[in-house]
Amino acid sequence: WRYSDKGSAGAAENHYSTMSIKDICALPVADITADDCVLFLWTTYPMLQEAMTLIAAWGFKYKSIGFQWLKLNRGGKGYFFGLGRWTRGNTEPCLIAIKGKPCRYVQSQSISQIIEHPVMRHSAKPPLAREKIIELMGDIPRIELFAREGAAGWDCWGNEAPETNIPAPEPPKRKDTSGQLSLFEI
């Protein structure tokens, strides 16, 4: 999504094309998700209010923080200090929201919210998040929107996901959405 601070070298627009909140809210997410499903939504703290708006626009209800990515420097030593007007951002939350009444597939009761992982290319998320989602929810159908890269076992959509030839901004329609999980990287 678009931030108001476009002049910064770290601005998303300097790394990839972005969409407005209005356009993201208008995506036909209902066409690619089951009536009863779970959403894992990455956001940043300056965009937390917009993330809640997006959750509601897509027909989901906020439940909890799924993960808190504590960003390490690229070499893995010391904490990464990102941008920030008040404090320097070095964590990124992944929210959990639900649509309908999804089965609680919880496979493990030992999943920690904390993910410590070095930063990667802009907006790329730690692979451990996908692993934790599968450990938590089981190996059920799942799709990742705005994927920066493909991942085994995940349907991916986005103008940078290598396994897709689907043009942005309209995501693919899925035939079988039973038990669908969604992980959105915005």
State the predicted function of each range.
Residues 1-186:
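Class I S-adenosyl-L-methionine-dependent methyltransferase catalytic core
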